[in-house]
Amino acid sequence: MSVVASGRVAANLQRLGIKLPAAAAPATNYVSYVCSGMQLHVSGQLPKNDVGGCMTGQLGASLTVTEGQAAARACALQVVSQMQAALGDLDRVKRVVKLNVFVNSSPSFTEQSYVANGASDLILSVFGEEVGRHARCAVGVAQLPFGAAVEVDALVELNN
């Protein structure tokens, strides 16, 4: 099931040929997002493939940078779906403040920042330069939940 959106950001999604997936339910004991004041915190999102399974593997071992970028992009799509679920209108996003990108990495893999570009590029395409340009942290980790290749969370500033 895909999400229906309206407004400027929805027009960008349509122009880009992107259909948001349904926002994923939390896998364990947490919530998918928290609105606090003028901030939205989106919990870590895993990369879903076209059939709803998790994109798994380790960068530098079983996955290439290009495959990692695709996984990061899939995570970012889930982040945007959570924003839509939380806000109802993606035009309420004033600024994507920060993305944290966790990359399942072999000990010798050092290209986490290139993998994270998959998420950053998607956010910039959807929200545009003024709203979508964000700070970012790209971190290599030994493992992620369910063997996921990448996990992305976000901090978003909201309009009134």
Curated annotation (Swiss-Prot):
GO cellular component terms, A-Z: cytoplasm
Keyword Cytoplasm among record annotations: yes
Pfam families named in the record: YjgF_endoribonc (PF14588)
Keywords from the named record: Cytoplasm
Signal peptide: none
Coiled coil: none
InterPro entries assigned to the protein according to its UniProt record, in alphabetical order: Endoribo_LPSP/chorism_mut-like, RutC-like_sf
Compartmental location: Cytoplasm
PANTHER family: ENDORIBONUCLEASE L-PSP_CHORISMATE MUTASE-LIKE DOMAIN-CONTAINING PROTEIN, ENDORIBONUCLEASE-RELATED
Full protein name: Protein TCP17
Organism: Trypanosoma cruzi
Source organism phylogeny: Eukaryota, Discoba, Euglenozoa, Kinetoplastea, Metakinetoplastina
